[in-house]
Regions:
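Hydrophobic alpha-helical membrane-insertion segments
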Residues: 35-41, 158-168, 258-264
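Hydrophobic alpha-helical transmembrane segments of membrane transport/permease proteins
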Residues: 35-83, 179-198
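Cytoplasmic-entry segments and transmembrane alpha-helices of multi-pass inner-membrane transporters
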Residues: 18-26, 30, 135-172
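Alpha-helical transmembrane segments of integral membrane proteins
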Residues: 18-22, 38, 111-148, 189-330
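Hydrophobic alpha-helical segments of integral membrane proteins
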Residues: 20, 28, 67, 71, ...
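Charged, compositionally biased N-terminal leader segments and the immediate start
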Residues: 7, 11-48
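An internal, D/E-rich "acidic patch" concept
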Residues: 2-3, 9-20, 78-134
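Generic hydrophobic transmembrane alpha-helix motif, especially the helices
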Residues: 153-213, 295
Length: 330
């Protein structure tokens, strides 16, 4: 009987892993389709937008149709928009994101160079958000009617309403120019204590992107709901640790859901923060590429951003399936 029970547990775990594996494969296939759709939409928008990437190469000259045609022919670029899209798609399928029209450098290399800076910024800001939101949410869930809980919640909402760019300029003026607490340099200047400079954009993005208030509100509501469930009341009556029973549904799942849902907004805020702080990340590179009509760079960054958002959604699905394997089949 003991061996039979152990075998049943092993079979159940294998079935759960199999369901999670099927879910991951399904999500990866969906990600490929979504990236294809994003690439098509972005390419069409760039094609319909005013300006011409070939005008960048003809800067200082009269960019007539003949000049554009000669440049297009020299670069081997198809004349139709769908021909250019299919050519780009074929190159991307082989891992080639093209070459920057402005610099002549491969787009993949530029993304690899600037990508870690944006990754540090986004992950660091999420850490700041959680360090602020989680304690306030836990305290507010436990002391819903307390004056301090209400004051903390109000303060979070007020801070989250501050525009990112405004807070960034205020922080630069106050902590760099007036108080001199942080160095006046950027990630492109690897001087002593330059790591201090990254703290300012991380804190600004983590505080003023609206995520703090959303995470606080969602965690407080979910914790309040879970704490009124019958199994929590039963655990409390038996003297069992309530937090251990409420952790998954009241904390882990809501927090994972909010992080995945707010990832696009964090990336959007990173574009503004990188511009304000002169931070050499993908957001600043995307703005420069938009000004230069550097379509290959814009397409490459759009693909990386879409893949990053989908990765956050995939991790959310894996965590959900790990907590409750039945969700992997839904």
């Amino acid at each position: 009987m003991v061996h039979s029970g152990h075998g049943a547990k092993v079979t159940t775990k294998l079935a759960a892993f199999r369901r999670v594996g099927v879910m991951v494969v399904r999500e990866l296939a969906l990600t490929a389709l979504l990236l294809l759709g994003v690439s098509l939409v972005v390419f069409v928008i760039l094609h319909l937008s005013p300006g011409d990437p070939f005008s960048v190469l003809l800067e200082g000259q009269a960019p007539g149709q003949a000049a554009r045609a000669s440049v297009r022919e020299a670069l081997g670029v198809p004349t139709t928009w769908y021909g250019r899209y299919l050519a780009w798609l074929g190159h991307m399928a082989h891992g080639n994101l093209g070459t920057s029209i402005r610099t002549g450098v491969p787009v993949a290399g530029e993304i690899v160079r600037a990508g870690p800076n944006t990754l540090y910024l986004t992950l660091g800001s999420l850490l700041v958000t959680l360090l602020l939101a989680v304690p306030i949410a836990l305290y507010s869930a436990a002391r819903r009617t307390g004056a301090l809980a209400r004051a903390l919640t109000l303060a979070v909402y007020l801070i989250s309403a501050v525009p990112v760019f405004w807070l960034g300029y205020v922080v630069i003026y106050l902590f760099i120019h007036r108080l001199g607490l942080f160095p006046l340099l950027s990630a492109t200047e690897p001087q002593r204590h330059s790591w201090l400079y990254v703290l300012l954009p991380i804190i600004v993005l983590g505080v003023a992107n609206g995520t703090v208030s959303e995470v606080t509100r969602h965690l407080r509501e979910e914790l309040g709901r879970v704490m009124t469930e019958d199994y929590i009341r039963t655990a409390r009556a038996k003297g069992a640790p309530v937090w251990r029973h409420a952790f998954k549904e009241g904390f882990l799942l809501p927090m994972t859901e909010m992080i995945a849902a707010k990832m696009p907004f964090v990336l959007g805020g990173a574009v503004i923060v990188e511009q304000v702080f002169n931070w050499p990340g993908l957001g600043r590179m995307a703005l420069q590429a938009a000004q230069d009509r550097d379509f290959p760079v814009i397409m490459g960054i759009a693909m990386v951003a879409a893949a990053f958002v989908r990765l956050a959604s995939l991790l959310r699905g894996v965590i959900y399936a790990g907590v409750n394997p039945r969700t992997a089949t839904e």
